[in-house]
Regions:
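Intrinsically disordered regions, especially transient/low-confidence alpha-helical propensity segments
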Residues: 2, 56-58, 170, 221
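Non-catalytic pre-domain segments flanking phosphatase-related domains
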Residues: 2-35, 43, 198-229
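Residue-level detector of alpha-helical segments with a strong bias toward transmembrane helices
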Residues: 22, 44-48, 162
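C-terminal cap/substrate-recognition subdomain and adjoining C-terminal extension
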Residues: 97, 101-229
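Functionally constrained cores in energy, signaling, and assembly domains
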Residues: 12-18, 30-32, 70, 88, ...
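Alpha-helical substrate-recognition element adjacent to the catalytic core
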Residues: 27-129
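Internal hydrophobic scaffold segments of catalytic domains
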Residues: 25-39, 156-168
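Generic structural signal for short, solvent-exposed loop/turn connectors between secondary structure elements
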Residues: 19-27, 52, 143-148
């Protein structure tokens, strides 16, 4: 019994030392990125999802077809390379579900030119439904990874970062995605103006020019030119 307790104590000390080395190195940041509409323009993956795989959503199909339909959002990729080349730790947190997640990891590895592995630097964090409303769960992983920064396009990304005590940075969603996916972006700028959604498309330019969003988040100022035909 005493021996077992001793080993548990030693293991705990080792875990604390390792955690401190990984997460508290001087000058090293832990930087997180959303995937869809942040790293990848993946609209066409979802638009090409076969009808018989839509309800429920076949995430295995989605995670297996980025190579066919997704395009890199180059300003974000340049930023990822900047952090990576300067020795900072890079993590990806997506609201996608995990089936065939290794295919997404392999795609990112090939395109970003450094190893991306599930549950090592790629994490799947699908939303949870509570009383009929779907809520983000990304803040749990952000806390566990002790992120310093999180880059994402959606309102839920900003909320998750704030809940986790992480500095949020908004990556400006391309207009083609705003039109396709109005909700979860400054409320919903393509719906009719309402108390719930008070901001118009014109209001976005005011936010963009001020480099601050509705949650007090920073706005990354280099915009993507858009998908290639």
């Amino acid at each position: 019994m005493r021996l077992s307790m001793k080993f548990r104590f030693i293991f705990k000390v080792i875990a604390i030392v390792y955690s401190s080395f990984l997460f508290a190195q001087n000058g090293i940041l832990n930087v997180g990125f959303d995937i869809d509409d942040t790293v990848l323009f993946s609209r066409d993956v979802f638009l090409n999802l076969p009808e018989d795989k839509r309800n429920p959503m076949d995430w295995g199909w989605i995670n297996s077809h980025d190579d066919d339909y997704s395009q890199l959002i180059t300003p974000t990729v340049d930023l990822i390379h900047f952090f990576h080349k300067n020795g900072h730790n890079i993590f990806f947190i997506t609201a996608r579900s995990k089936p065939k997640g290794k295919n997404l990891a392999n795609f990112l590895t090939d395109k970003l030119m450094f190893p991306v592995e599930v549950n090592k630097n790629l994490f799947f964090s699908p939303r949870e439904t509570i009383k009929g409303t779907r809520y983000t769960t990304k803040q749990r992983i952000m806390k566990r990874l002790r992120l310093d920064l999180f880059y994402g396009d959606a309102d839920t990304d900003m909320i998750a970062a704030l809940k986790a005590g992480v500095h949020p940075v908004r990556v400006v969603r391309h207009k083609a995605s705003i039109i396709s996916y109005g909700p979860n972006y400054f409320g919903n700028t393509i719906d009719k103006i309402s108390p719930k959604n008070p901001f118009s498309m014109e209001d976005l330019n005011i936010f963009y020019s001020s480099n601050v969003g509705i949650f007090g988040e920073s706005i990354y100022p280099i915009f993507w030119e858009g998908p290639q035909k």
